[in-house]
Regions:
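Cytosolic nucleotide-utilizing catalytic cores of signal-transduction proteins
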Residues: 1-136
């Protein structure tokens, strides 16, 4: 059933290649697998989760990602390459970026701990999301 959601999939297609589509169809093991194999390893690897999330929210624009994170573009390139090694997906590839985007959303929804994003001088988070002040 999940293969209908990705008509361009190579045939035969492996079940693991359809993880996002399986999640959309309500497959709980696929949901856990995406969180465990993509979100958690990126989160455990320092700045990789933040870099990948920012890159995806910047529409895959390397320079914009570097500006948002206050780092050199080569740092972004290195981190994206490293993220691919850690999770097995190359976010510069459209299909892999889709898989990673779904995995990151699932990780946030699953209650996985979130790291704070750096805040720019204008009060915006580096990813472009508004920062909501919290009371202590």
């Amino acid at each position: 059933m999940a293969v209908r959601a990705w008509p361009e999939a190579p045939r035969p297609v492996l079940a693991d290649d359809l993880l996002p589509e399986r999640v959309l169809a309500g497959d709980t093991p696929a949901r856990r697998r995406l969180v465990d194999t993509v979100h958690r390893p990126l989160e455990a690897s320092g700045a990789l989760l933040e870099t990948v999330a920012t890159y995806l929210s910047c529409g895959g624009a390397l320079e914009a990602t570097a500006r948002a994170l206050f780092v050199h573009p080569n740092t972004v390139r290195y981190r994206l390459r490293r993220a691919g090694e850690v999770c097995g997906y190359d976010v510069t590839d459209p299909r892999d970026a889709y898989v990673v985007r779904v995995a990151l959303a699932l990780g946030r929804l699953s209650g996985a701990p979130r790291r704070a994003l750096p805040v720019r001088a204008d009060g915006e988070a580096a990813s472009g999301a508004a920062v909501v002040p919290t009371q202590l």
